[in-house]
Design a protein with these regions (language model features):
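A non-catalytic alpha/beta surface segment that caps or lines the substrate-entry region
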Residues: 19-65
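N-terminal glycine-rich anion-binding loops that anchor highly charged ligand groups
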Residues: 12-19, 37, 69-72
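N-terminal capping segment at the start of a domain
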Residues: 1-31
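Catalytic-core environment of secreted peptidases
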Residues: 44, 48, 60-93, 98
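Alpha-helical metal-binding/catalytic segments enriched in His/Glu/Asp
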Residues: 76, 85-124
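Flexible glycine-/small-residue-enriched beta->alpha junction loops
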Residues: 120-152
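Conserved small/polar residues in nucleotide/adenosyl-binding loops
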Residues: 154-156
């Protein structure tokens, strides 16, 4: 794997999903562009041999099971939602870098001793609902569902 080329290609593809005429990105939580981007990341996870799954709010987890200590997990990632006309590296670079690092480690060393997970959080920006870190709050169990009035928008 050519790391630099892989990162560029993944960023280029993600940047095409939700791109706007001004050169920025608009991928609001649960929008069609956000969902398309999450599914692209899910496909990339599966392509490198990860088990990929969404939780109930749309956080996406890709996992490679550890060979010796599978219950111990090293997790890395970020988010792919944006504000209106957001930057092309904000959030998604962390997801792409994490995915590429796990791929590189697996190709070079094989199955890890500890489990590795890449996460693409459902939301960080707070651009869709009057709350921030919706994905993270759900992940750690401190979310207040009253902050998000219309949970029926969730269709992963």
């Amino acid at each position: 794997m050519e790391v630099e080329q892989t990162v560029k290609e993944r960023l280029q593809k993600l940047s095409s999903i939700g791109s706007d005429p001004t050169g920025g990105l608009t991928r609001l939580l649960y929008s069609d562009s956000w969902l398309s981007a999450q599914h692209y990341v899910q496909d990339q996870m599966k392509n490198i041999g990860m088990k990929a799954a969404f939780d109930e709010v749309g956080n996406l987890f890709g996992r490679i099971e550890g060979s010796e200590l599978p219950e111990e997990t090293i997790m890395t990632g970020s988010h792919i939602d944006t504000v209106v006309n957001g930057g092309k590296l904000d959030g998604q670079f962390g997801v792409v870098a994490s995915l590429t690092a796990v791929q590189m480690l697996q190709e070079k060393y094989g199955q890890p001793k500890r489990s590795l997970e890449v996460i693409s959080m459902a939301e960080e920006e707070g651009s869709r609902f009057p709350t921030v870190f919706w994905g993270s709050k759900n992940f750690v169990g401190i979310a207040n569902n009253d902050e998000v009035k219309d949970l029926s928008l969730i269709h992963i």
